Amino acid sequence: MDSVIAFDRSPMFRVYKSGRIERLLGETTVPPSLTPQNGVVSKDIIHSPEKNLSLRIYLPEKVTVKKLPILIYFHGGGFIIETAFSPPYHTFLTSAVAAANCLAISVNYRRAPEFPVPIPYEDSWDSLKWVLTHITGTGPETWINKHGDFGKVFLAGDSAGGNISHHLTMRAKKEKLCDSLISGIILIHPYFWSKTPIDEFEVRDVGKTKGVEGSWRVASPNSKQGVDDPWLNVVGSDPSGLGCGRVLVMVAGDDLFVRQGWCYAEKLKKSGWEGEVEVMETKNEGHVFHLKNPNSDNARQVVKKLEEFINK
């Protein structure tokens, strides 16, 4: 039975009938470096040994007494693949920190199917709360105490990480987690979905749709609503309680999720939420193209837009 494939999402992963998962992508890691890379240093922290939850912290090499904006980043991968330590994420966060002159904290949460939804959200929430223990300057991590500006906190992520950023910001307001603490969120090609097309412009490929539905079953096997689960069908939920003042949604023209991103922004505008939302669309590009081709002009524009949003 261990050799019988139950769900094949190559080239990303395979799940066998025994329950075993074979991750084909996103398992390579790169170490942090106190030797500057592109003017940025980094280190890893285990902040919850009992759950083995860790973070990678990035800091500009040349820092002054001036506090820096804090970027808390959640990686993508459908809640199943990739880590905060994957080479594409290390490269992207290094570039983002160099451009925005910010302090970045890249969160490594536990993944499905070993740790199914909602565990990735709970791990991310715990990581956010750990970061906030540094508000008074007496937290366990010196870099955050010394250099982090808690008046400028941004949550960001791509794909599943964008999904996580939305849900944490909703929860932060609902649970009154330091009112008005989160300045804004940056959702890059957010992983939102629904059972039926979100609008008349959403064109669905049958094979890709089955891939999304199957992947969600792997990530959230106990979901009774399937892809209409509120964790995933974000556009079908009420976003008016979003706990930040500004939102940037980045979408890619050839991405399966492009209309979800646009409709999320439109719904946010009409919901009664009183913040500002903007959308940046990159034409003729696919899902997370900026991670796959980080040296392309379009990828550089993603970093530039992120920098502008943080430092506005």
From Swiss-Prot:
Note the superkingdom of the native organism: Eukaryota
Q: What keywords appear on the UniProt entry?
A: Acetylation, Hydrolase, Serine esterase
Please provide, alphabetically and separated by semicolons, the GO molecular function terms listed in this UniProt record.
carboxylesterase activity
Q: What is its EC number?
A: 3.1.1.1
**For this protein, what reaction is catalysed?**
a carboxylic ester + H2O = an alcohol + a carboxylate + H(+)
What does the entry state regarding organ or tissue expression? Expressed in leaves, stems, flowers and siliques.
The answer to whether keyword Hydrolase applies is yes
User: For the motif Involved in the stabilization of the negatively charged intermediate by the formation of the oxyanion hole, what are the positions?
Assistant: 75-77
Q: Which Pfam families match?
A: Abhydrolase_3
Which residues are annotated with the PTM N-acetylmethionine? M1
Say if the entry is tagged with keyword Hydrolase.
yes
Q: What is the similarity comment for this entry?
A: Belongs to the 'GDXG' lipolytic enzyme family.
Q: Which PANTHER family match?
A: ARYLACETAMIDE DEACETYLASE, CARBOXYLESTERASE 7-RELATED
What protein am I looking at? Probable carboxylesterase 7
Q: Which organism is it from?
A: Arabidopsis thaliana (Mouse-ear cress)
Gene, per the UniProt record: CXE7
